[in-house]
Amino acid sequence: MRRHFQFNSCGNLMTFYQDPELWFASGDCLIHFYERGQSRRGASIRVSLADIEFSNCGPFLDRFLIYDAPETPLSSSDLDKYAESPGFFNAPAPPAKYEMYVPAPEHLSREEAFRYHLTTRNFFAWMFEKPLVGECLGDALIALLNRMDEFRPNQEVNQDDMLAYLDEQGYTDFRDCPDHALAVLQFAEKLRDRETWTDAFVHCAGMWDLLDKSAEFEVSH
């Protein structure tokens, strides 16, 4: 199924409350977009720690993971019983075992901090095969790759994983979609990927009369 980039102005996600696409009730790890003890607004993302570990994000885990979440962990049998209960979909989520606090660097402005958090959110979107959010897809892709290089050890693997993610999300489906073509053209220039750049460029040329109507045009022009 084709997945679409979600456009959001800065004001739409400024609070970073629970992200419905990245909040899994059975997840055992809570992700907070602030320093520990500096806010009471709660976690923004709830996912499985095993999935994070499977994504080869060792530096990210070493830097941010906290093991002393206050709740008592549930056993697998407890989780099975919980899932089978009649009120499962309306019941409170089971307690989490782990927490991660991922604050923006202190020197960033308010707008820069927002963009930092947005990229952190998109890092998890890549991890769990969800669409990206942001104002411009090209910028979001480049920011995500930079964050992957920070949080994962192998840049070559990161590039391959990003290209696979673009295909999975439908961002390389350029048919009648100048947004995708321009965004991937910009991203391929950053990546220095000749094949991807050429494919995006050819589609841009074929849609030349639509390019200036795209939100990506000023960024990539």
Residue locations for each model-derived region?
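BTB/POZ (also called T1 in voltage-gated K+ channels) oligomerization domain detector
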Residues: 1-151
